[in-house]
UniProtKB/Swiss-Prot annotation:
Residues 73-88 have a biased composition (Low complexity). Residues 1-39, 268-281 have a biased composition (Polar residues). Keywords: Cytoplasm, Endoplasmic reticulum, Phosphoprotein, Repeat, RNA-binding, Stress response. The modification Phosphoserine is found at S115, S934. This is Vigilin 1. GO terms for biological process: intracellular mRNA localization; regulation of mRNA stability. Pfam families: KH_1, KH_Vigilin. The gene is vgl1. Required for cell survival under thermal stress. It comes from Schizosaccharomyces pombe (strain 972 / ATCC 24843) (Fission yeast). InterPro entries: KH_dom, KH_dom_type_1, KH_dom_type_1_sf.
Length: 1291
């Protein structure tokens, strides 16, 4: 057994120690139990009587042998650690000297053949082999005294195993004696042997002091004995480890099962600090906060979530502590693998570009990854908080996606430019389109994003952002959508100007239009749309007008829609409305079940009631007369409406008596009335929630209320009950501890336990959250603890659920399988309708029922004809009756017809992957059976269903078969060199040719219609095969030959262009080049020349006249690239760029200005005049734009347009340099005098003086700013002062 202690064992445990076990006199006392002269020692080992006779027979006792082998093993380790690599002698595993046999009491027996194996080794020695090479039994590479090693030996004859446990002195519990004490090693090992039915031999090496335990027995018993030895003898230690708080519930498990399992398996004691009922929560409850905790990561630089931590303490032997630690770490790692990141540093202007058209980019990012990307929609509102991008999922995927989005954002900031467009707010909805389709369409077509201001804001500015080459197209599409609809607005408030409160009447009319949908017929008649104000706008105190917007495609339609709207508004004078106050709790009686009362009033009295328009607390009900006047006077109509309103109110009050009561409860007890998350109040109100209102403390609309008030209002009997229960709760709250100690337990049928708990504990968790109780469910028993009222409500709900489960019934109905399809209906619509109607579940047989063993076996049909129905007894019976009636009906209308079709047409009838026949089945709701295709010319097709549907399906099948009969095949000879010209880029020319000949452009149909041969012979390669309808084939043949003839007559033309113009000729992604080729029916060959100083020779292939057209288009592109430079002082850079001149040059002259990147230079301010004295102080200043630096701007476009643009730039530069600014100090209260009614005066001054005048709107700001030429500014100043002087003279 020399090698036994050296076998390497994979272990995750720390090293162990034991004190030396000596073979002293105490051991000799055990030898007397063995008869004298016996030649064997019991394999119970040292503790079960090591025989002196055996010692004389072999020279050494088993313990001495083991001790000697320990010493030899240590010597072997030293040799292994030396630098010599001499070959080790082989070990004879059957040697009696090396491995002495321990004989039984009955006499000697044959040596037992054992196989010493490593736990992780894949190669094991076979029992019965003569010897085992030392190389096959590796020694430990190092002599770690603290390591724990074990080997396993399986004995084939008895199914026993042998395991060796070696403990170093450091890993043994201190002050442990071998024998003689109750807690000695001998007593401990004897107890373990008795408990586990194993045999254990113990020895200690004299040099290393390592203690070896040789354990024999069944596998499970050996493992249990090993664990007990480590628990009782091994070194004790205590470890602490951090743990996220939200994972504690998962570690504990349901009713502590997980924690108990870990402690039992590892023989440890685990302590978890108490924290807000953490120890009582189940593992299912623990899963809920996991997502919240994982949402902690908020920035790109910190993707690791920051969890609230607690400390877990583990006590036990050193191996058990480490095993328990690993189990807990596995649970923690499992529940912290995901994370969530919020990215808020990316500009919201880039969100649409990052999202892509219709979220295309998001789908690509999420595809194939455990990742969820949420990029919100952005609005042009700098004051609004940033709505961040949210990434959720697996950590590495989230980090990768975050880095990618940041890179994309930086790239977009460099390669895109924003443009602000002032567009009236009323047109924003047309840019956005329904559900944002307009903005997505612009993004898809131009690559530019459009950002609108918030709906509730007052800004008119729309932002368009995209690449510089595409921004003009994005602006064009945006303006096109904005101007695609004509908009008009009608202020209906003016129709009620004579009323005391025109806004109230106009808002009632608007609400009536919203409720009664009276504008829909006008919209259909006039081809317009009416946009009514929102209810919030009609309720606003600041809004004093009701505006209805009209939009349409033509001015005439909008004008007609306006006239119709005004006519409709005039039909509803103020006399047709009457307001009555009805308690909100009574309003549901006014409405009636499903609105029956409102419908009755509408039919009998021609009135419409506007109920609860402004929320549940709105007591106002508006009675609107919508019938004809019939000659009645306004007073008569008002009287009739008043009588009807009082009748409605009296009827509602008669339906239920509303009372209110206020009880005084000290505010400190209000929290007990409400309960955790409102649970107690919910339990008190119960099913009377719609009939009772409970308000605690002071409220604004009851001025006399106090902090101690509890206000209850509702139906009298419900108010009486709620008051009584609130008083009881307050009484109970005085002793809070007793209140929460109420417990209710009851038994129920054990088979319903999983139904009470719910999937993943969902039912129990829901009750805990709603009613704030603790629930423990065991097999057939439930225990509920919490507030008495909550416990009673919880028990009532669970008992109700159990009663429903007990009532659960399963019925099996036999219906022929041929009718199942009709009973289920298209997409299961009939069976779903049956399930919803009777609240049952219906299960039809499936094809995989026989192979699929998962799922609910009770609901699985036992035969192909069996239908299973499950639910309440009465519901199941009713569902069965209706199902059988439906079966009888289907059986009575079943109709079958069979036709024969050509066998060659079968594949066309079936279609690719069965698509054609499936479409016919779905379209006509029939069943189609196609016979086996044999060598016969025809194949039978059987169609079953309703007679009309069968006949229609047969017509469809016959049409396909007839089409196949008309198919022909032709082979035409066309030289291979012309094939690519016939096909064109991506098959575009071929598609157009087929379309001209009446064929389909579907790619599948095209591939079937025409094929270009790739044969081996020259004749095959010059062949084109046409296969399809005779007329199309003949037309296609003629057209292809015509095209080939045209190709033979083609010529090559060359044109030279500067290399700098090549990009404009090719266009983005080759679009311009393809456009030229398509319009001129030519092909362009453009060589790759990189030197900008060289010219590029473009070859044009096509007919002579088409080549000339292509030349003209290329020359036009070259002409549009004319460039001229202009010198601009850096001091005017900012003024020119901020103006609208640059936009006008692009839009009007199609000219582009390339400006260098410079830092703007601010001009020097020069004061021309300064008059601080006088009634109105003023100052006139100008700016000195002359500076030492200037830059060259490049102007590109057509030559004549470039010259015009340069003239405009020079003129603008001159105006900027000559501009003056006047600052006029005018008191704020006089500003309206210079503005005039509707801005008439100030606009007149602007027009006369040709200047810009800015009047401040901020209170307290008195400075009026005038900008323009010096003469104009002085003129404007004089006119303003004259106007103010005239007003003073008049006063």
């Amino acid at each position: 057994m020399e090698h036994l202690s050296n076998l390497e064992q994979p272990t995750t445990m720390d090293s162990y120690d034991f004190q030396k076990l000596t073979n002293d006199e105490n051991l000799q006392g055990t030898e007397s139990q063995v008869p004298s002269g016996s030649k064997s020692a019991s394999t119970n080992g040292l503790l079960s009587a090591a025989s002196s006779a055996a010692g004389s027979s072999f020279g050494l006792t088993p313990s001495a042998i083991l001790q000697q082998k320990h010493e030899n093993a240590q010597q072997g380790k030293k040799q292994n650690n030396s630098k010599s690599f001499s070959k080790k002698p082989a070990i004879d595993v059957h040697s009696e000297d090396a491995f002495p046999t321990l004989l039984s009491k009955t006499g000697p027996s044959k040596p037992r053949i054992v196989s010493w194996v490593r736990k992780t080794a894949s190669n094991t020695s076979v029992a019965g082999s003569d010897s085992v090479s030392r190389d096959k039994i590796p020694f430990s590479a190092s002599s770690r005294a603290s390591s724990t090693k074990s080997t396993l030996s399986s004995v084939k004859e008895t199914d026993f195993v042998t395991e060796t446990l070696i403990l170093s002195p450091d890993n043994q519990a201190p002050r442990m004696s071998f024998v003689g004490k109750p807690n000695s090693v001998a007593e401990i090992v004897r107890t373990v042997m008795h408990q586990t039915s194993t045999r254990i031999n113990v020895s200690t090496a004299s040099k290393t002091k390592n203690t070896t335990f040789l354990i024999q027995g069944k596998t499970s018993a050996v493992k249990a004995a090993r664990r007990q030895i480590l628990k009782l003898i091994g070194r004790r230690e205590t470890k602490t480890m951090p743990c996220p708080v939200f994972v504690v519930g998962a570690i504990i498990g349901t009713n502590g099962q997980n924690l108990k399992s870990i402690m039992d398996r590892t023989s440890t004691r685990i302590q978890i600090p108490k924290r807000n009922n953490t120890a009582n929560e189940s593992s299912d409850d623990a899963k809920k906060p996991e997502k919240e905790e994982n949402s902690a990561a908020s920035t790109l630089d910190d993707l690791e979530p920051q969890y609230e931590m607690t400390t877990i303490t583990i006590e036990g032997d050193f191996e058990g502590v480490e095993l328990a630690q690993k189990d807990i770490e596995a649970i923690i790692n499992e529940r912290t693998s995901n994370t969530t990141v919020r990215i808020s540093h990316i500009s919201t202007e880039l969100y649409s570009l990052l999202r892509g058209p219709d979220g295309k980019n998001i789908k690509e990012l999420e595809e194939g990854r455990d990742l969820k990307v949420q990029i919100p929609f952005a609005y042009l509102d700098p004051s609004a908080p940033v709505n961040p991008i949210v990434l959720s999922g697996e950590k590495s995927a989230v980090r990768e996606c975050a880095l990618y989005l940041q890179g994309q954002a930086e790239e977009l900031l460099r390669t895109t430019i924003p443009t602000m467009l002032p567009i009236p707010r009323r047109q924003h909805r047309f840019i956005n389109g329904e559900k944002g389709v307009g903005i997505q369409d612009i993004l898809r077509k131009s690559g530019c994003s459009v950002i609108l201001p918030p709906i509730n804001g007052d800004s008119d500015v729309v932002s368009v952002r995209g690449p510089a080459l595409n921004i003009s197209e994005g602006i064009r599409l945006t303006l096109e959508r904005a101007n695609s609809t004509i908009v008009d607005a009608v202020n209906i408030t003016t129709a009620y100007a004579s009323s005391k409160n025109p806004f109230d009447i106009a808002s009632i009319v608007a609400r009536l239009f919203l409720r009664s949908r009276k504008l829909i017929p006008l919209e259909e008649e006039c081809a317009v749309q009416y946009h009514l104000p929102k209810r919030e706008e009609l309720q606003s105190n600041s809004n004093k007008t009701v505006i209805i917007e009209i939009s349409g495609k033509s001015q005439e339609a909008v004008r007609e829609g306006r006239a119709k709207l005004l006519a409709l508004v005039n039909q509803f004078p103020e006399s047709k409305f009457y307001k009555v106050t009805i308690d909100p709790l009574l309003q549901r009686y006014v409405i009636g079940s499903k609105g029956k009362n409102l419908q009755k009033l509408r039919n009998e009295h021609q009135v419409e009631l506007l109920v609860g328009e402004y929320g549940e607390e709105d007591p106002d009900v508006i009675v609107c007369y919508i019938g004809a006047d019939d000659g009645k006077s306004p007073d008569q109509i008002q009287k009739e409406l008043a009588d009807l309103a009082e009748s409605v109110k009296s009827s509602a009050e008669a339906s239920a008596k509303i009372v209110s009561e206020i009880i005084q409860v000290p505010s400190v007890y209000h929290k007990h009335i409400v309960g955790p998350k409102g649970t107690t109040l919910n339990a008190i109100i119960g099913k009377s929630e719609e009939n009772v209102i409970v308000q605690l403390g002071k409220v604004s609309y009851r001025p006399d209320s106090t902090d101690d008030d509890v206000y209850i209002r509702g139906f009298s009997k419900d108010v009486e009950r709620v008051v009584s229960e609130i008083k009881q709760v307050v009484r109970d709250a005085k002793n809070h501890e007793i209140l929460h100690s109420h417990v209710e337990e009851f038994d129920f049928p054990a088979q319903y336990s999983k139904n009470v708990i719910g999937k993943n504990g969902s039912n129990v968790s829901s009750l805990r959250e709603d009613l704030g109780v603790q629930i423990n469910v065991e097999e057939g028993h439930i225990r509920i603890q919490g507030i008495k009222k909550n416990v009673e409500e919880t028990a009532a709900r669970i008992k109700s659920q159990i009663e429903a489960l007990i009532d659960d019934t399963i019925l099996r109905v036999n219906i022929p399988n041929d009718f199942h399809r009709q009973l289920i209906g298209s997409n299961g619509k009939y069976v779903r309708r049956l399930e919803e109607k009777f609240s049952v579940r219906v299960r039809f047989p499936r094809e995989d029922d026989s192979s699929n063993s998962t799922g609910n076996e009770l609901m699985k049909p036992t035969s192909p004809d069996e239908v299973v129905i499950r639910g309440g007894k009465k519901s199941v019976a009713a569902a069965k009756q209706e199902l059988l009636e439906l079966y009888e009906y289907e059986k009575s209308i079943a109709y079958t017809s069979t036709i024969d079709i050509p066998s060659k047409a079968v594949s066309r009838v079936v279609g690719r992957n069965g698509s054609t026949v499936e479409n016919i089945r779905t379209q006509f709701d029939v069943k189609i059976d196609i016979g086996d295709v044999s060598t016969e010319e025809t194949t039978p097709v059987s169609v079953r269903g309703a007679k009309a549907d069968v006949e229609n399906a047969i017509k469809e099948i016959s049409a396909i078969a007839e089409e196949v009969k008309n198919l022909v095949e032709k082979v035409i000879k066309i030289d291979r060199e012309y094939h690519r010209y016939l096909i064109g880029p991506n098959g575009s020319k071929l598609q157009n040719t087929i379309k001209e000949c009446g064929g389909s452009t579907d790619k599948t149909e095209t591939a079937r219609l025409i094929s270009f041969s790739n044969g081996n012979s020259e004749e095959e390669r010059n062949s084109v095969v046409l296969r399809g309808d005779k007329e199309i084939v003949e037309a296609l043949e003629t057209r292809l030959l015509e095209i080939v003839e045209e190709l033979k007559n083609q010529v090559e033309e060359k044109i030279e262009v500067p290399q700098r113009c090549i990009s404009s000729i090719i266009g983005r992604m080759g679009s311009t080049r393809r456009d030229i080729e398509r319009k001129t029916s030519t092909m362009l060959n453009i060589p790759n020349v990189l030197d900008p100083e060289e010219t590029v020779t473009i070859t044009i292939v096509g007919s002579p006249e088409n080549c000339e057209k292509a030349k003209e288009m290329i020359q036009e592109k070259v002409a549009s690239q004319y460039t001229q430079m202009i010198t601009v002082p850096d001091t005017v850079y900012e003024s020119i760029m901020k103006g609208i001149l640059m936009k006008k040059l692009r839009s009007d002259l199609k000219v582009f200005v390339d400006t260098p990147e410079i830092k703007p230079v601010q001009p020097t301010e020069v004061v021309l005049e300064d008059h601080e004295d006088g009634v109105f102080p003023w100052k006139l200043v100008t700016h000195d734009y002359t500076g030492s630096s200037s830059s060259e701007w490049a102007v590109r476009g057509h030559k004549e347009n470039v010259e015009k643009a340069i003239a405009s730039l020079e003129k603008s530069i001159k105006q900027v340099m000559e501009n003056c600014i006047a600052y006029l100090g005018i008191p704020t209260n006089l500003h309206r005098r210079i503005i005039g009614s509707g801005g008439s005066i100030i606009n007149k001054i602007r027009k006369i003086a040709q200047v810009k005048i800015d009047v401040p709107r901020t209170p307290g700001d008195e400075i009026v700013v005038v900008q323009g030429s010096r003469a104009g500014v002085v003129k404007a100043k004089d006119l303003i002062f004259e106007r103010l002087q005239e007003n003073q003279n008049q006063e």
